Amino acid sequence: ALSRVYADPENGEITITDPAQSLDLGAVGKGYAADAAAVRLHELGVTCFLLDFGESTMVCAGAPPESGGWTVAVREPDALLNLSGRREVPEYSGTLTLADRCLGVSGDYQKYFASSGTYYAHILEESTLYPARYCRAVCVLAPDAFAADYLSTALFAQPYAAAREAAENLPNVDVLWIFADGSREMTPG
């Protein structure tokens, strides 16, 4: 539980008192690294690029010549989740055209384990510490990868109504939810 995690801001340290517990920075680590790489490319004078940090985090700067942006496919969650433990050939539910935007995707199909025909995803709901099951995936477009990465995880772990309300109050952020029944909801934008 988080009650066993202590932060010391003065020394920049975090202590975990339970040796069986660990912290995973997956919700923000790739976004932070992607932003740092993008800053370095800009410092070197590179203005048009796409950085793909493992399917769930992307930085799209500029646009390829004679295009409106980078075309990025959104995976169909059901095409990837297979309870036998095998990964199927991915299918795509649509594409996005991105220029000077970052994409963060969190889903229950990316990291999980299966037991007795039930799968357990890697993103936990804070109040129960059990896998969140409000939707199958959340895709976030934001000005920076850190925000896109963080927000996709945070919005995934909340009930849809609360997540939608939070998302609609975020400037320059667009969100797509994909639900278990295949339906989709998007913020205006």
Regions found by a protein language model. Give the residues of each.
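Mature catalytic core of soluble alpha/beta enzymes
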Residues: 1-189
